UniProtKB/Swiss-Prot annotation:
Substrate binds at residue 251. NADP(+) binds at residues 25-28, 48, 52, 82-85, 133. Mg(2+) 2 binds at residues 190, 226, 230. It catalyses: (2R)-2,3-dihydroxy-3-methylbutanoate + NADP(+) = (2S)-2-acetolactate + NADPH + H(+); (2R,3R)-2,3-dihydroxy-3-methylpentanoate + NADP(+) = (S)-2-ethyl-2-hydroxy-3-oxobutanoate + NADPH + H(+). It comes from Methanoculleus marisnigri (strain ATCC 35101 / DSM 1498 / JR1). This is Ketol-acid reductoisomerase (NADP(+)). Gene3D superfamilies: 6.10.240.10, NAD(P)-binding Rossmann-like Domain. Residues 182-327 form the KARI C-terminal knotted domain. InterPro entries: 6-PGluconate_DH-like_C_sf (IPR008927), KARI (IPR013023), KARI_C (IPR000506), KARI_N (IPR013116), KARI_prok (IPR014359), NAD(P)-bd_dom_sf (IPR036291).
Length: 329
């Protein structure tokens, strides 16, 4: 069973005399930094010029270059995009990190695939909230928290796990629950979930359903409403209470169709494709492909993104959402 931690397992005094540098001030960076500060931690922000510098300053933080923030910090939380982390680490973090400092991540990609190799004199940990930054912040302000994962890759000081737990408490995660994992497990399951189910799987399934109905002569608007618009209704029910709550909330006709037709759509061929995708994640093929894609300015990424942006389902969706007050700006 997975090890679970709660408020009583995390000692906030572990961070009492430490300065935390949050590198990056996007959604996660801002949410985590604000929560840490409200929990009594000393936080500085490390950024490259421009971008979020002004926003972080307006939020009342001391903002420095990445290199300067790292020099001042005992804990360095890297919250930059995966594809940017290695270059920033080599240029600005590695030359300035203190001995016995703690290097922290919210995703294990760069450590797991060897793009960042820290010295043996520092702790290397992960604290990964299972929710976007704005939710991390909102739930904290409500007195609750978003669950998180922690992992210890390297324990140079003997305090790595204690630091990770104290940080998780600082962002509010121990108010919910914190699960212990490994960098390998977090990275591989996270990538698989994104590719096969949450992002790649769902969008491909929706497009296939939309195209099937449109090709059969049904109105694109009807196809959109049936295979995309109503997705949120079903997913929300599953999120709240699993498959059981969803099936308790739909008609018997819908449930019978779900149970008898669903496995024909997601059958043995899909399972085999998922196994292949998982193997490419495990053996590093996907990571290598993504790193090479970034080295040549993302031609495949950009072409596929444009193609989906121009798909009929996006045009129809924009029109239908225009009729709905909740989506009007």
């Amino acid at each position: 069973m997975v090890q679970k931690y709660y408020e009583s397992d995390a000692d906030p005094r572990t961070l009492e005399d430490k300065t935390i540098a949050v590198i990056g001030y996007g959604s996660q960076g801002r949410g985590q930094a604000l929560n840490l500060r409200d929990s009594g931690c000393r936080v500085v922000i490390g950024l490259r010029p421009g971008g979020s510098w002004q926003k972080a300053s307006e939020d009342g933080f001391e903002v420095y270059s990445v290199a300067e923030a790292v020099k001042r910090a005992d804990v360095i939380q890297i919250l930059l995009p995966d594809e940017n982390q290695a270059a920033v680490y080599r240029a600005e973090i590695s030359p300035n990190i203190r001995e016995n400092a703690c290097l922290m991540f919210s995703h294990g990609f760069n450590i797991h695939y060897g793009q960042i190799v820290p010295p043996p004199t520092v702790d290397v940990v992960m604290v990964a909230p299972k929710g976007p930054g704005h939710m991390v912040r909102r739930t904290y302000e409500e007195g609750k928290g978003v669950p998180a994962l922690i992992a210890v890759h390297q324990d140079a000081t003997g305090q790595a796990r204690a630091i990770a737990l104290a940080y998780a408490r600082g962002i509010g995660a121990t108010r919910a629950v914190v699960f212990e994992t490994t960098f390998a497990e977090e990275t591989e399951t996270d990538l698989f979930g994104e590719q096969a189910v949450l992002c790649g799987g769902i969008t491909s399934l929706i497009k296939a359903g939309f195209e099937t109905l449109v090709d059969a002569g049904y109105a694109p608007e009807m196809a959109y409403l049936e295979v995309l618009h109503e997705t949120k209704l079903i997913v929300d029910l599953i999120y709240e209470g699993g498959f059981t709550k969803m099936r308790d909330s739909i008609s018997n006709t819908a449930q019978y169709g779900d149970l008898t037709r669903g496995p024909r759509v997601i059958g043995p061929e899909t399972y085999m494709a998922m196994q292949e995708i998982l193997e490419e994640i495990q053996n590093g093929k996907f990571a290598k492909e993504w790193m090479l894609e970034n080295m040549v300015n993302r031609p495949v990424f950009n072409a596929l993104t444009r193609a989906d942006e121009e798909h009929l389902i996006e045009q129809v969706g924009a029109e239908i959402r225009g009729f709905m007050p909740q989506f009007r700006k």
